[in-house]
Amino acid sequence: MDREVHRMASLRREGSMWRSGGDVFSRSSSRFQDEDDDEEALRWAALERLPTYDRVRRGILAVSSEDGGAGGEKVEVDVGRLGARESRALIERLVRAADDDHERFLLKLRERMDRVGIDYPTIEVRFENLEVEADVHVGNRGLPTLLNSVTNTVEAIGNALHILPNKKQPMTVLHDVSGIIKPRRMTLLLGPPGSGKTTLLLALAGKLDKDLKVSGKVTYNGHGMHEFVPERTAAYISQHDLHIGEMTVRETLAFSARCQGVGTRYEMLTELARREKAANIKPDHDIDIYMKASAMGGQESSVVTDYILKILGLDICADTVVGNEMLRGISGGQRKRVTTGEMLVGPARALFMDEISTGLDSSTTYQIVNSLRQTIHILGGTAVISLLQPAPETYNLFDDIILLSDGQVVYQGPREHVLEFFEFMGFRCPARKGVADFLQEVTSRKDQGQYWCRRDRPYRFVPVKQFADAFRSFHVGRSIQNELSEPFDRTRSHPAALATSKYGVSRKELLKATIDRELLLMKRNAFMYIFKAVNLTLMALIVMTTFFRTSMRHDRDYGMIYLGALYFALDTVMFNGFAELAMTVMKLPVFFKQRDLLFFPAWAYTIPSWILQIPITFLEVGVYVFITYYVIGFDPSVSRFFKQYLLLLALNQMSSALFRFIAGIGRDMVVSHTFGPLSLLAFAALGGFILARPDVKKWWIWGYWISPLSYAQNAISTNEFLGHSWSQILPGENVTLGVSVLKSRGIFTEAKWYWIGLGALLGYTLLFNLLYTVALSVLSPFTDSHASMSEDALKEKHANLTGEVVEGQKDTKSRKQELELSHIADQNSGINSADSSASRKGMVLPFAPLSISFNDVRYSVDMPEAMKAQGITEDRLLLLKGVSGSFRPGVLTALMGVSGAGKTTLMDVLAGRKTGGYIEGDIRISGYPKKQETFARISGYCEQNDIHSPHVTVYESLVFSAWLRLPSEVDSEARKMFIEEVMDLVELTSLRGALVGLPGVSGLSTEQRKRLTIAVELVANPSIIFMDEPTSGLDARAAAIVMRTVRNTVNTGRTVVCTIHQPSIDIFEAFDELFLMKRGGEEIYVGPVGQNSSKLIEYFEGIDGVSRIKDGYNPATWMLEVTSSAQEEMLGVDFSEIYRQSELYQRNKELIEELSTPPPGSTDLNFPTQYSRSFITQCLACLWKQNWSYWRNPSYTAVRLLFTIVIALMFGTMFWNLGTRTKKQQDLFNAMGSMYAAVLYIGVQNSGSVQPVVVVERTVFYRERAAGMYSAFPYAFGQVAIELPYIMVQTLIYGVLVYSMIGFEWTVAKFLWYLFFMYFTLLYFTFYGMMAVGLTPNESIAAIISSAFYNVWNLFSGYLIPRPKIPVWWRWYCWICPVAWTLYGLVASQFGDIQHVLEGDTRTVAQFVTDYFGFHHNFLWVVAVVHVVFAVTFAFLFSFAIMKFNFQRR
């Protein structure tokens, strides 16, 4: 090869002798010759003389005047240190407009490589006889109810031990598929939902789940998956957008680029520079700088990042945070592009992209796919892209098509032959139908008939298997088989094509990148750390004033109080680490994604999260120790002060590491919040304070020796009590006071135990961090979803595959309905005509047709700080600029515009869904001013994010919506019939028993969730319906089903408005009118679409300079293209201004004027009540839904009961028979310790584990309340009331086990008091957890606030410092501390009436309980009432918070 390159270079040198002096090597270098710039030539010559290593790191950069230099000045730069500004300016010069300049830029790159004979590496992917099978539960067994979860767990263990049969049924996901993916060709993967597209992409990318049964093989250039690293050779781009919300778009992509590295670009560049020097070729400066900069790894912001931002159209939002549910960020379409860009910045040569166009308008999709096509064709990549609804022009960009259906390859080969194959099978694509849409529908039993074209033969359903068999005999299929029979010649594989190293950059670089990201996130989450520090400061001030030195003496009695103060310091610091739990779990989904993509190993993630927390630990612990140490009156020695500080630092680190480890093992908020308190409880109970070491049972003593708290307790106690303050010798004893106190509690008395304790804590810190790293290395992301299918869906799948008619299928009815409704585009066909009455049956419950008109509507928000920092002086950012229009009954309106045009914003404003910002303008409903309370009753809003309760079924979701939104006059039977009609209409009947689940985690697929969202609104029978992106995320067939549903809804006389991104021709032409907006929030066309889009085309073609539409081109795509910002700039026009001066605008103004006046004889909307159903019905419905939600949420309900059983058995065995011993004071302390630990820790677990459940349901509540389904109180009632029976079961389990094992006195009264106090204690803790969520915006802050109060309750519980010994200024708090009342009730009911005298004391047990703790037996009834009051108060505050605070930002 080198000889060949040398020969080419020689030929070029010889040829240059007889050319006319010009440079023959490159068009791009002619400018270099023409300029005749001596200084530049000298600079280049100097560069050429550098060694290759230095030469590839330096280049000549043109600095334009706006970048700080003189116009066009050339400067020599180190490309490894190219600034962000220079990088962006360079990309702007190279790719000014992604549409026009991108191909030219790539051709320049290719030309430069071709001139010296260097090839880009290419990859051919082959898959042969690939079969993927999964085991699924069929029918109700797949629902995760409490019963099923127990049965499934027992069954799984039985299967593993081969003692029980496997009840799951095998389901083939991919059935014996074979094919070839060629380099330099774009392959489009099509298929209806459930056809196996994602599974095929994952198989090709080498990322299939280990639980699946896989046979067959996938090879890259003839190499098996085990011979290289597929995760780095190929990039799989998921359909789920998982990103860290606090990072900006640029930071997200830059981090990805930094981790993935530059691949073989550097080696290629070195070879290129060497050959160019030998051939005396001078490259284009900008191309040279780009190639050099893109080959330099380890940069915080790379030129490749700026390039990808540019071609994906993300440069406009590059410095905006990505955002999440609670943090406003970029739009859904932009987030989808970030997911794509995250992988494109890497060096992977093969791309497997899963539904990358969801949420994008068709012009943006076209631009992205076109950029990818240019890259693949010119630079020799390999790409398989799955798209849901590709527009015809996007479809035409692809070279090859793979059509999957029910796990079989129906067609794979050149795009040109696909229609030929289906005509060969007897099916033809209609004229105004997108080919991609036709392909996705033609294999479906319900849609196939309409495309039959053989008039000489009657139509008969052609099953998928028949298509697949026919394809093998079709000429395209035969040629693939022939090619597969010849093995790939491995000698043709470029050595740089397949990655063999596991990670893209060195370990040092990976660690540096993750440290930088962790620092950035700490800065963005500074509020959390400040909050924790303030929390600890307040806690320290309370502790300091509770254990006040002036009220405490150094004697044996107060020695116990000092021990309590030390234990509380340990407890506080330990609890402080608890917040790590929620913060860690929230970051894990993104971590698992990046780990599996081999961005970095687990240790590169865990080390920064540990090391960078250390300075914060110094601050937090410092705050506590510096405030409390001397004020409490601990030993005044400076060395002992710093030793206590050092020990608490080690404990805090150990605690944080422990909770990170638990989060890493649990991987789920509910599971982690269950096992977090369990570990705390185990360590505390065996730590030597609650139960003294001599009293620990011999079968539990091992627990004492492995509890970190026992080492901390020994170390902190010896540090204090061996000090000078405690050195006096007691009369009649030969040991110091300090040693005497230590001995009385079974604590070691040698000074060495401080160092042993410190060493143990540091050892545990290392151990837990190591275990956390191991957990994150080996565990997969948490999923509680078991693969399941309904029986109907399985039968339907089988029928589609084989053609066998399934018994009981309502085939005739549904096919007749489908055929009636098939041609959406035809406004006069089955959709609008009388024969569609069958499909409208049930959609005609009585309602009043209403119009909505709006005039000069403006919406603004406070100017973001980032924009103010850039010098913008206005106080507000205007998002809608005086928008006017109207929507009428029976008219289907499309609200369109490019991403960022303000479509969803306008819809939110009109629907009254905005929670912030400033709204101006006039909005009227049938002429009357809009009132949100009544408007919510007659309107429906289908949100883009499909938000539903995850633990109910599809049918239950619809029942709930209809129950609360249909008026009470509609009886139960009519309601059920109506629900069945809607389910039939939206094709959800086969999914009626399917669990909804969480998006991207479990339950329904994207398109099924979308249909459910629409059905939930349709069952409310609204007059006006808003739909935000109803077809986003759906394939062509599902989109057609949805649009038929929408069309039918309009035909009943309702007003329907849809925002829509990338409609196909037939979907677009199903709309009657179009409301088109441009970026910036202004309308540019409001009017009819017309037959075959004639009116729309006529309007825009009438504007000077607008290009005419090509035959067969999608009008929606054409319209977005000709009205883009780039076109406005090129034509020098403002489309919004043209619209305002048009006749159409005047007609619309007159229409708005007419609709703004109430019709004669009409009355304003008025309802006797705010809600459709009575308050009682709302409460019952909410309770009904929560009942199902809890029953099917075993990760919360079952885990909590399991936790309770474990704790009960642990406590029962730990405090075995201690209840019968009441002879000594220590016996009472031990018994009280068992009560104290149980109350505090089981209570905390209940409080913590309910929070994630409430957070998920609160998001659903925001949607349902906005829809006017119910008020806040019934929701709160349902959430609170459903806990009562579950907590009753929990109390009985705990109470019976513990009461009998500890051996408390068996009398009916004492046992019932014990159960009563435990029940209400668990209730108030659970309601307190709910209240914390209600008062805070997210889980993390709720966890921090909760733990703050747990600490205060712990302090004033009366266990660490009895109420009579608390300083008078804090004693009042005991009366409002719930835990203090619980201990009062438990201790007084068990011991307050025992009259025998204590050993070594003159008092009876009852007197001691009264004197020492201040507990009176005759006060029990008051204590009981207070317990009820606490539970009711927290439940009420939860209701109040839910009613008053809305943390959703819209």
From Swiss-Prot:
Pfam families registered for this protein in UniProt: ABC2_membrane (PF01061), ABC2_membrane_7 (PF19055), ABC_tran (PF00005), ABC_trans_N (PF14510), PDR_assoc (PF08370)
Keyword Nucleotide-binding: yes
Disulfide pattern: none
Main location per the UniProt record: membrane
Domain ABC transmembrane type-2 positions: 509-721, 1177-1391
CDD domains recorded: ABCG_PDR_domain1, ABCG_PDR_domain2
InterPro entries named in the record: AAA+_ATPase, ABC2_TM, ABC_trans_N, ABC_transporter-like_ATP-bd, ABCG_dom, ABCG_PDR_1, ABCG_PDR_2, P-loop_NTPase
Membrane topology according to the record: Multi-pass membrane protein
Residue ranges crossing the lipid bilayer per the database entry: 527-547, 559-579, 614-634, 646-666, 670-690, 756-776, 1198-1218, 1236-1256, 1284-1304, 1311-1331, 1341-1361, 1372-1392, 1422-1442
Stretches assigned to coiled coil: none
Span of domain ABC transporter: 158-431, 852-1104
Any single GO CC term annotated in Swiss-Prot or TrEMBL for this entry: membrane
Keywords: ATP-binding, Membrane, Nucleotide-binding, Repeat, Transmembrane, Transmembrane helix, Transport
Binding site for ATP 2: 897-904
PANTHER family with a match to the protein in the record: PLEIOTROPIC DRUG RESISTANCE PROTEIN 1, PLEIOTROPIC DRUG RESISTANCE PROTEIN 1-LIKE ISOFORM X1
Family assignment from sequence similarity: Belongs to the ABC transporter superfamily. ABCG family. PDR (TC 3.A.1.205) subfamily.
Known role: May be a general defense protein.
Protein name: ABC transporter G family member 37
Organism: Oryza sativa subsp. japonica (Rice)
Gene behind the chain: ABCG37
